[in-house]
Amino acid sequence: LPEWTPLNWEELNRFLERVIAAAHPIPIVLYNPPYAQKILKPEEWSEISARFPALIGIKVAGGDATWHEEMRPASNSLSVFVAGTQLASGLVHGCASGSYSNVACLSPKGACEWEQRMRSDPEIALQQEAQIQNVFADALSPFRQRYSNTALDKALATSGGWAEGLTTNVRWPLSKIPTDEIESLATQFRAGLPFLFE
């Protein structure tokens, strides 16, 4: 959804009609980021999914147990992708289908193994989710107000060190997290989340 202005219901429907027509016959996945001017409620997702069958998935921040319960009707017709830091609770107790994963930015292999653990040992995966949330909050809090989510994801990938040549560079006009912050971030993530780097 357009994130720069809060659409009213009529505008939102008009936007979806045009996007779906332009994408036809390919179905769409809609991103409603947590920083958008309008965050759709679970009942609104249910109404939209009933009206637009070409909408097959959504990328949203996720929520608590109440949010997941309220999202269940919409999740019958939509794949619900939540933030990677909420994937275990979303899969184990909620209606999540998967995630757009900031955890995978940090460690793709670790994120895959953690997702497998959600199915094989959900209690451990839920404990690890709490660790992930705490470490991410502590490590990234100095940067959240000054840098975009894109810059944070690039810093996560660079800190993870899982591929040669990764840098914190982002496209103009975004600002990058300074390269000299990466060593400290990498140390925090590896010390706090060793199971993602085994």
Predicted segments with their positions:
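Active-site-proximal beta-alpha loop/turn segments in soluble metabolic enzymes
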Residues: 1-3, 31-34
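Aromatic/hydrophobic pocket-lining residues that form the small-molecule binding cavity
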Residues: 12, 16
